[in-house]
Amino acid sequence: MADVATKHPMEDEVKKTEASSLVGKLETDVEIKASADKFHHMFAGKPHHVSKASPGNIQGCDLHEGDWGTVGSIVFWNYVHDGEAKVAKERIEAVEPDKNLITFRVIEGDLMKEYKSFLLTIQVTPKPGGPGSIVHWHLEYEKISEEVAHPETLLQFCVEVSKEIDEHLLAEEEEVKTPETPSLVGKLETDVEIKASAEKFHHMFAGKPHHVSKASPGNIQGCDLHEGDWGQVGSIVFWNYVHDREAKVAKERIEAVEPNKNLITFRVIDGDLMKEYKSFLLTIQVTPKLGGPGSIVHWHLEYEKISEEVAHPETLLQFCVEVSKEIDEHLLAEE
C-alpha cells in the first residue's frame, strides 16, 4: 500500500480561499489493490456492507429513501470519528458508473453542527499499466465560522476506511479463489433490498413456494411437493423454471429451516444442475432493515463443480435476484 499523498497545492488553495470566505476543499488519493469497479460498488451498490469491512469506523448504513446508488436517494450512516459516535444523513447527488464516481451531500447529522454544506465525492480509477486502483476523495464544504477546523481528520478517516474496504475486498477474492485452486468448490453471495417484510418473503419459500410461480411466472413455472410438508426439514420439492432461456427442473431437499432467522436452505438432489455440479446448496436468509421498513434478502450459493470447464453459477445468482424482486412486487401488491 503506497503512502497517502495529500495534494499540497490544494491545501494552499484552501488557505487562500479561507482568507476571504468559509468555503474550502480537501482532496487525497489512496492506492488500493482491489478493482475500481468493486470499490465503487461498495459505496454505490452495497454501502450497508461497509460496516463489515471497517467495523471500527462505520457501524451501519441504512437506506431511508429511494434505492442504493440512485441519485436523490437518502442514506443514513452511523460512524465513529475523533473517538465519538456520530451520524450523517446524506443525499446521493451524483452517480457515474462509467467513471466509478459517487457524490454524497450531507443534509443532517453531526457535520451540520459545524458546516453549512458538505459534499463528499469518491472516484475510483484503475491504475494504468497494472492491477489495482486509485481512490480519489474530494471533500467540499462551507464552515459556519472561522473557529471550525478544516475536516482534515475526516479526510484521514476516509483514508482508513478505504484501506479497510480494500483488505475486505481482497479477502473476499481469496475466499473464492483459494478453494478453487485445489478443488472445484465455490460459493457466491448477493444481497437484494426489498420493501416487503422479512417474514412475508421467507414464508414464500418456506410456507408456500408453490405461489412463487404467481409472483415470477417468467422465471418459475411451478413448485410441487414430492415428500413431507412445506417448510419442513427433509421434505422434497420439485421446481420447474427457466434459466438461460432453457426450461429446467430441480429436485431439492430442505436441509435447514430457522423461522426466527427467516432462513431456509435447499440442497439440489436431482435435475439440470446435477449435470454440472456434484453438490449444490441454496440458502435464503431475510433480515429486517435496521431503522426503517423493508428487508435485505441474502442469497448464498455453495457448490462443487464436476470440472473446471463448468462456469460459476453467476447467471443463476442473477436469476435469484430477479425472482426476489418479482416476489417483492407481488407481496406489495397483495398488501
UniProtKB/Swiss-Prot annotation:
What is the name listed in the Swiss-Prot or TrEMBL entry for this protein? MLP-like protein 28
- Enumerate the CDD domains for this protein: Bet_v1-like
> One Pfam match, by short name?
Bet_v_1
The gene it comes from is: MLP28
User: What residue stretch is flagged as signal peptide?
Assistant: none
The GO annotation for biological process reads:
defense response
State what this protein does: Can bind steroids (in vitro), and may also bind other types of hydrophobic ligands.
Q: Looking at the record's lineage, which domain of life comes first?
A: Eukaryota
Upper classification of the organism: Eukaryota, Viridiplantae, Streptophyta, Embryophyta, Tracheophyta
Q: Which family does it belong to?
A: Belongs to the MLP family.
Q: Which GO terms describe its cellular component?
A: cytosol; mitochondrion
